[in-house]
């Protein structure tokens, strides 16, 4: 049960060839498929259909389970017709000029005509500037300037925090909370005890009962800071509970405004399920509203102008990449397999939502292809394939030799061929950036993944319900996080020598925690639909088995607590001081986890493309922002 459910092929995919190479093979394939209503021709049979499962018996006596998934929502002709004017060189030239102007704004924060800016709020100005460019998704242009600003702020950091300016003796909560979050995310050593100095005699964060905009902003920054917690930081737990409660109450009393929109977004997506591109789009809209109300200064307007232009330039690139993805999907022959979910557009939305660097095209495309392959395998192992067929396929993946697949059913031959060719092609491309062969790493991860799938298929076939620990250890592998992350990561222009892989891949704590979060969160969103498809084993059902008398609510509470603690552990693995593995080497794997978590924030956003998922595709991929 996968929670996830690079190069374009030069010609029609081998799956299509496998389907159409001979009349005999076509009939052999259509016998089971046509009887299940998945081909336009063939015999019909009696079928029983539940809310999310169709079972049918073919005329050769084979009974198969099929998830009742909705079809692809995004027409290929529509995707191929997309166009954008923002790919023109004139827009890129305008962006370069604006980048230079924003760099000058950064520099002016330190000096203006040889004099330092106001000592009253210079620290807050530095932090706000960094916060703005990061939330707007344009920080990649200003890494040097950000480092200078944060070094400056950190030089005034104390155990009691900081004030708004270098000469302000009294520390304030707003600047301290904003500084804590940004400094911690950039690898500076800061401790949460700093927030103890903002408590009253009752041990609570000191604030008035009046919901002033200044106070709300301070508590909002405290909430954002509390989400970057490490294990055992009780102060951060208390800050999160207090600030979340305060902000929810504030929403009931303040009018609808840019501030209320910001609060709603942060409460909804927090940090670990936040997509950077969605945040950029949301923050652009918020600042645009402030512009209409004449609430922005000249510098922020300049930053906003660059953010909108950059958003739309990348939007033009997204359309071209999405066309490539859609062509690959169509040529692969997967649209002819109607028992699988077709979610390539959603996968692309996810990956382009976490990586907006134009040069990382192969990373994005390989992620989409790997995730779609995972989804095909998931649907094949969970529902359509018989246990005997799956045993043959599992053995074939271990052999990794397409010449030895004659024993497979025709539909499996096609799936195997696309899997084999796509993985090998991506490994060849990865060799260019890594300078070595990475196929052995990916094959090992793929074999482990298929093995975990196979074990779950055996459980389904035999009706076995494992213990929680047995299910969870296997489920971390079958979540698909590792295999979805590993191959695309090799496509980056970042070297991943063996000692770095040991820190982010199996069996590292980083990999274990990332897989754990995805398995746990996925099960809380999917367990009811999985049970309807005949998949009894889940974290919920296995917990209840181990704890007789417990309810689903008990199980969900236990698992949600596990998720919260594991997120803190993953935060630590990302941000802990480590000279051997810089944050940049871990960041893409971490952000993939955030993106996948986003799609399971409230529901299974893959299997069922809700209005929220559709709106995400529209807002972050299909539509530009108004200039």
Swiss-Prot record:
Associated pathway: Terpene metabolism; oleoresin biosynthesis
Cofactor note text: Binds 3 Mg(2+) or Mn(2+) ions per subunit.
Record-given protein name: Carene synthase, chloroplastic
Main location: plastid
Residues reported to bind Mg(2+) 2: 378, 382
Residues engaged in binding Mg(2+) 1: 378, 382
EC number(s) given by UniProt: 4.2.3.107
UniProt cross-references to PANTHER family, sorted A to Z: OS04G0344100 PROTEIN-RELATED
Keywords: Chloroplast, Lyase, Magnesium, Manganese, Metal-binding, Plastid, Transit peptide
Similarity remark: Belongs to the terpene synthase family. Tpsd subfamily.
MF annotations from Gene Ontology: lyase activity; magnesium ion binding; terpene synthase activity
Function: Terpene synthase (TPS) involved in defensive oleoresin formation in conifers in response to insect attack or other injury.
The organism of origin for this protein: Picea abies
Compartment(s) where it occurs, according to its Swiss-Prot or TrEMBL record: Plastid, Chloroplast
Matches recorded under InterPro entries: Isoprenoid_synthase_dom_sf, Terpene_cyclase-like_1_C, Terpene_cyclase_plant_C1, Terpene_synth_N, Terpene_synth_N_sf, Terpene_synthase-like, Terpene_synthase_metal-bd, Terpenoid_cyclase/PrenylTrfase
Residues that coordinate or bind Mg(2+) 3: 530
């Amino acid at each position: 049960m996968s929670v996830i459910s690079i190069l374009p092929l030069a010609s029609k995919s081998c799956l299509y060839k496998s389907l159409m190479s001979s009349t005999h093979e076509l009939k052999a394939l259509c016998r089971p498929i046509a009887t299940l209503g998945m081909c336009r021709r063939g015999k019909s049979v009696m079928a029983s259909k539940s809310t999310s499962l169709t079972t049918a018996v073919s005329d050769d006596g084979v009974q198969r389970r099929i998830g009742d998934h909705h079809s692809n929502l995004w027409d290929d002709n529509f995707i191929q017709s997309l166009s954008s004017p923002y790919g023109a060189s004139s827009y890129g030239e305008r962006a370069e000029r604006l980048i230079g102007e924003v760099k000058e704004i950064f520099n002016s924060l330190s000096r203006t005509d040889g004099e330092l800016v106001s000592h009253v709020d210079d620290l807050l100005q530095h932090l706000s500037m960094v916060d703005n460019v990061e939330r707007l998704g344009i920080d990649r242009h200003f890494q040097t300037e950000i480092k200078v600003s944060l070094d400056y702020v950190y030089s005034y950091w104390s155990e009691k925090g900081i004030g708004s300016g270098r000469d302000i003796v009294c520390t304030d909560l707003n600047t301290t909370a904003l500084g804590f979050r940004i400094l911690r995310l950039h690898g500076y050593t800061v401790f949460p005890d700093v927030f103890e100095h903002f408590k009253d005699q009752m041990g609570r964060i000191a604030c008035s009962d009046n919901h002033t905009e200044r106070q709300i902003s301070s508590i909002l920054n405290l909430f954002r800071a509390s989400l970057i917690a490490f294990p055992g930081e009780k102060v951060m737990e208390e800050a999160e509970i207090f600030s979340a409660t305060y902000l929810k109450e504030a929403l009931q009393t303040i009018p609808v405004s840019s501030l209320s929109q910001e609060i709603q977004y942060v409460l909804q997506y927090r940090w670990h399920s936040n997509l950077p591109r969605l945040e950029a789009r949301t923050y652009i809209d918020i600042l645009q509203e402030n512009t209409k109300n004449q609430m922005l200064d000249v510098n922020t307007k300049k930053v906003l102008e660059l953010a909108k232009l950059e958003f739309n330039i990348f939007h033009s690139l997204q359309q071209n990449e999405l066309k490539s993805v859609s062509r690959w999907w169509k040529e692969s022959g997967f649209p002819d397999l109607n028992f699988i979910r077709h979610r390539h557009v959603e996968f692309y939305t996810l990956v382009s939502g976490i990586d907006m660097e134009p040069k990382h095209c192969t990373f994005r495309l390989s992620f989409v292809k790997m995730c779609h392959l995972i989804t095909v395998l998931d649907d094949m192992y969970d529902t359509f394939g018989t246990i005997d067929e799956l045993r043959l396929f599992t053995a074939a993946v271990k052999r990794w030799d397409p010449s030895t697949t004659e024993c497979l059913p025709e539909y499996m031959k096609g799936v195997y061929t696309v899997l084999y060719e796509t993985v090998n092609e991506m490994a060849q491309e990865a060799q260019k950036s890594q300078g070595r062969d990475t196929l052995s790493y990916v094959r090992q991860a793929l074999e482990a993944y298929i093995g975990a799938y196979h074990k779950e298929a055996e459980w389904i076939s035999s009706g076995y319900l494992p213990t929680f620990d047995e299910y969870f250890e296997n489920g971390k592998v079958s979540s698909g996080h590792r295999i979805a992350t590993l191959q695309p990561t090799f496509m980056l222009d970042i070297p991943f020598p063996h000692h770095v892989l040991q820190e982010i891949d199996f069996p590292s704590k980083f990999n274990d925690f990332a897989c754990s979060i995805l398995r746990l969160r996925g099960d809380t969103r999917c367990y009811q639909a999985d049970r309807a498809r005949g998949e009894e084993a889940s974290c919920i059902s296995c917990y209840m088995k181990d704890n007789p008398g417990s309810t689903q609510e008990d199980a969900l509470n236990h698992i949600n607590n596990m998720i919260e603690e594991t997120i803190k552990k993953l935060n630590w693995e990302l941000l802990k001081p480590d000279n051997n593995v810089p944050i940049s080497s871990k960041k893409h794997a971490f952000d993939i986890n955030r993106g996948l978590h986003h799609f399971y924030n409230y529901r299974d956003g893959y299997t069922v493309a809700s209005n929220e998922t559709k709106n995400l595709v529209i807002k972050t991929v299909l539509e530009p922002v108004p200039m």
